[in-house]
Amino acid sequence: NTAGDHIKSEGYKLESRNWPQAVWEKLVYPSKNIKMVLCGHSGETPKMADLNNIDYKPSSSFRIDKAHDGRNVVQMMFNSQQGDGNWNGNGGDCWLRILEFKPDGKSIGVRTFSPLFALSKRTQHMAWRTDDYDQFVITIE
């Protein structure tokens, strides 16, 4: 049995669930101590012209919004589940976001890596994604 089977037979018993906008309005926006939000399972499938020309930008995003007290809240969305262009296959080619918390206490280096591609000499050259939306530094106030 899978979780999906259980929900089909037992129903989804959680009431008053919150969708992303409600999470922002009820939790993140009024909070005095949330500085960063990480999320996934959203966005679009990467655009694939061919195996050597893949645009992963639709499956990730980054933005900074203001909380109720005017401070910045960093938000990063990364949907690795669709990294191979669909919902099945390699489960997104095992893409991970590696966050490196820097000694200054404010900077976080972000890199995108696939251990699946790193395993094979044939695909090692594709193990690190280096576009500006896959490799960047976040500054937390």
Language model features: what each stretch is:
Residues T45-E141:
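Binuclear metal-dependent phosphoesterase catalytic core
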Residues N1-K35, P46-S59:
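Active-site-proximal segments of metal-dependent phosphoesterases and phosphodiesterases across multiple
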Residues N1-T2, G40-S42, N79-Q81:
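Active-site metal-binding loops of divalent metal-dependent hydrolases
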Residues K26, M36-C39, W87-N88, F101:
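Compositionally biased, low-complexity repeat tracts
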